[in-house]
Amino acid sequence: MSNIVKVEDVEKVKGLFGDWENNFLPSCLQGIMGEVYSFDCDNPKSAVAVIGDFRMFAGEPNENLLKFDYKDSECDYKCGEMDIIIPQNDKWAELIRDTFNSDLEGVSELKEIKRYSTFEDMSQFDVDKLNEIKSSAKEGFEILDIDEEIYNRCLENEWSKDLVGIYNNYEDYSKKGIGVVLLDTRNNEIVSGASSYCTFEGGIEIEIDTNEQHRRNGYALICGASIILKCLERGIYPSWDAHNKGSIELAKKLGYREKGEYTAFELYRK
């Protein structure tokens, strides 16, 4: 598996991904963030796009590409204990099940899940409603842009790392990213945040996280409305790919329309 290499010229692998509509692919295929790996960069048959925790496999299903450990590669982005694997088609999904459901070294569990995509349509958002949601923050709470201080604070806490975590540093985030947090000013505590998980031409993929101790208070809704409004002001699209039922229901409250569900896998490493 040592001949798996990072693809420097992504134009050579774009054909493998075809017209696959996936919110995380553009960042990789446009060369903005993330990376693509393959066996033969000149005549690739299979490839995987890697960004943050996400792995998107395309082309001819290949077991060695699935087993490749990006932690030991030149991958610039930090890999966590869980990978989210997205297959291009049923053949890839079948190979993923066969490969990781066996007793494979370094893998503790494979969980098959459904994710939910949304329609990309600027006209679906009700700005007045979003402003109403944003202004519903109670007294003592303040919505702040993610500046360098907030960026560093997000990295300090496990629950908020994903808000900014796959950008190289604050300079990289300030150029490509956009985000807000909700601060409890009474104790200077960040309770929730919404930010760009990744960036692509003309848009971002939204990441929303809330401190577990402060969930079910409407904070995610407030942060979600705030970042959508910021994106609309900049003329960029706030893309939303939901990881679970709760996420898609939150998206609907903010104006998104569900497009459909698709199969993905959570791969937990030892």
For the regions a language model picked out, list residue spans one by one.
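Short amphipathic alpha-helix that is part of the acyltransferase structural core
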Residues: 1-22, 121-169
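N-terminal ordered "arm"
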Residues: 7-52
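Acyl-donor-binding surface of acyltransferase catalytic domains
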Residues: 34-35, 39-151, 265-266
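A structural microfeature
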Residues: 46, 191-192, 260
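Conserved acetyl-CoA-binding loop-helix of GNAT-fold acetyltransferases
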Residues: 64-72, 206, 216-233, 249, ...
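Conserved active-site alpha-helix within GNAT-family acetyltransferase domains
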Residues: 93-105, 221, 243-261
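A conserved beta-strand-loop-helix scaffold within acyl/acetyltransferase catalytic domains
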Residues: 165-186, 190-211
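Conserved hydrophobic beta-strand within the GNAT/NAT acetyltransferase core sheet
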Residues: 208, 238-241
